[in-house]
Amino acid sequence: MPGDVVLVEGDTRISVAIKYLTQSSWSHACLFVGDSGSSSHELCLLEADLQEGVRLIPLQHYSGFNLRICRPVSLTDQDRGQLISHARSRLGHTYDLKNVWDLVRFLIQKPAVPNRWRRAMIGLGSGEPTRAICSTLIAESFQSINYPILPVLGPEVGDEGEVPVYYRRHFSHFTPRDFDLSPYFEVIKPTLEVGFDYQQISWAGEEAS
């Protein structure tokens, strides 16, 4: 469904660094934007690529990788359209190489990094509005429609049940795993969505070695 976040378990050196820093299997995130808008009407993902920057790729681009689909819950059609429009407006922006070099330096040196510093390291970057990494691009797009990912609950909660106040995290501090951890995204398993029937599995007579 357009607006779904697709998490990817990559195997490059940078992917390994991201997975270590975030203590997660997920090193990359894409946004499913639906129709490419071209004459081919190809279904596409939007991502921030190291070499090509923010781009559209075919839906099947990561078909050989371990994936997880995270679907925003109760997203209205209007907000879904605004979300995708915001993300598409970043097409052509370049990748935030400063953030990449921070991760490469960490991977080469392999310092002892306390847990409390890991998010801060990921949050490093150039800060330029025309540069992004995969998860910050998607996080900024969701924040543009006020959709929560992992907000911070403020102390302004009254004794008589007033609505609590939430604070946004800066979008540069989000990592792919945050969409998996968010209570506001539903994890979708494609094999179940298409109608899984365990009785249709053909089992071999012996166990795998």
Regions found by a protein language model. Name each.
Residues 1-209:
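Cysteine-nucleophile amide-bond enzymes
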